[in-house]
């Protein structure tokens, strides 16, 4: 059943993962990227978020409101910056979020709000120096 709902959509992408696979090898890089995605999912859950899916080195989450998503995005950046295991490889994340009407169907989310959030993440510059 398809339901229309106002949601905040968040995408977080691991910046530098291509280089990581080249320098660390497939298994080590996949393990590290997986650890980062788990950390991001934990942060999302603390802010009332739900992980919709992971796509390679990216996580897609929904939140009940904009403030939940914004606080999660801030804490995600903080978590990556302050985790020594993630900083060994100078990793960062790019986060994009948008609030709007979305279609929820079989646990997945579709619509313009989703596309806008994905574009925001794509256009964001990863900051490793903050």
Q: Could you say what each language-model-derived stretch is?
A:
Residues 1-71, 79:
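Catalytic NTP-binding/metal-coordinating core of nucleotidyl cyclase/transferase enzymes
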Residues 60-130:
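Catalytic beta-strand-to-alpha-helix segment of the class III nucleotidyl cyclase homology domain
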């Amino acid at each position: 059943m398809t339901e229309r709902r106002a949601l905040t959509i968040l995408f977080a992408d691991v910046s530098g993962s291509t280089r990581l696979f080249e320098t660390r090898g497939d298994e080590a890089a996949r393990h590290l990227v997986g650890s980062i995605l788990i950390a991001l999912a934990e942060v999302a859950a603390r802010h009332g978020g739900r992980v919709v899916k992971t796509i390679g080195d990216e996580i897609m989450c929904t939140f009940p409101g904009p403030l939940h998503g914004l606080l999660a995005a801030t804490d995600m950046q903080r978590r990556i910056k302050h985790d020594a295991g993630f900083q060994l490889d100078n990793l960062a994340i790019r986060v994009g979020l948008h609030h709007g009407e979305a279609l929820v169907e079989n646990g997945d989310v579709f619509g313009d709000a989703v596309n806008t959030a994905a574009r925001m993440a794509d256009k964001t510059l990863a900051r490793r120096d903050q």
